[in-house]
């Protein structure tokens, strides 16, 4: 199937020109169907079998799995098709027009991370994929930037068990083998309103929340003291109070107070255990004020992730790149892929470009990224 694809830069241009924004706000959220159609056509042209998978619980979002080869094992290359929304007033270029300037390619998704699929396609354009000795899978997921619904659903429903996977998130080609998780909760306190001239006739939700926050801070200190992973720049689980709102007037007893908080657990800490620790921390308040305090998820939680440092994937990639793997504090889809096979996070561009105005790919990443994909496909699918 040689040379059936457009040139690399035109593939990149087409990906950036196809909007696929994910947002919790319905007015900003977009389907990724057009982008999936583009990718499905190109991978079909290369000889892959292509399956498009609707993702339940989303607004018309899809995963795409392109596969070739038979048998067990093989390699999975994966990434997400969606981008974050953009702030029109802060971009100096059209986010959906690939712009080349000063050794950079500008556009929404150039770094995070639609452009990774252009690298995969370009690396495979001259490969007869029907002759690979082990399977090669390409997965394009939906909604990573909001719920990670695509990766969650794929990992829960697929029977595939590749030998290993690489997620092409922007890491400046520094291989990542572990990251923290993310839990985002809302704590709600329901009081009883009344006139401020007689506080005893009501229940002040702000005062109850003040008590709850004291117990949450004790949990924060306990997490810091009990759990450590020295490879991380912040080597303990973090707990952050991000948003609070309560009451509506200075002369009313506050009837409702709401606190948004997050916890970033280390690899190996289970989500159930953390939820249990939070509930235990708040138990004294709940017992003192029955039925007035609740805890709920703001977003579906993401567990921490770790690829075994002695796995063949780590050894091969470290040798190819001449560098050691690292760990990071941010989250990716790796915990879900790791349930299928050992997984690394590794791709072009810097994470510092993600979610920024005038997002860009430095062209110095083009050649080494193409070479890396070619080498890992050769190692894991030809041998």
UniProtKB/Swiss-Prot annotation:
GO terms for molecular function: acetylornithine deacetylase activity; zinc ion binding. Zn(2+) 2 binds at residues 112, 145, 355. The active site is at residues 82, 144. Zn(2+) 1 binds at residues 80, 112, 169. Its cofactor is Zn(2+); Co(2+); glutathione. Pathway: Amino-acid biosynthesis; L-arginine biosynthesis; L-ornithine from N(2)-acetyl-L-ornithine (linear): step 1/1. The keyword Cytoplasm applies. InterPro entries: AcOrn-deacetyl, ArgE/DapE_CS, Bact_exopeptidase_dim_dom, Peptidase_M20, Peptidase_M20_dimer, Peptidase_M20A. GO terms for cellular component: cytoplasm. Binds 2 Zn(2+) or Co(2+) ions per subunit. It catalyses: N(2)-acetyl-L-ornithine + H2O = L-ornithine + acetate. Its main location: cytoplasm. It comes from the Bacteria. Keywords: Amino-acid biosynthesis, Arginine biosynthesis, Cobalt, Cytoplasm, Hydrolase, Metal-binding, Zinc. The keyword GTP-binding does not apply. Catalyzes the hydrolysis of the amide bond of N(2)-acetylated L-amino acids. Cleaves the acetyl group from N-acetyl-L-ornithine to form L-ornithine, an intermediate in L-arginine biosynthesis pathway, and a branchpoint in the synthesis of polyamines. NCBIfam families: AcOrn-deacetyl, PRK05111.1. Homodimer. This is Acetylornithine deacetylase. It comes from Salmonella typhi. The gene is argE.
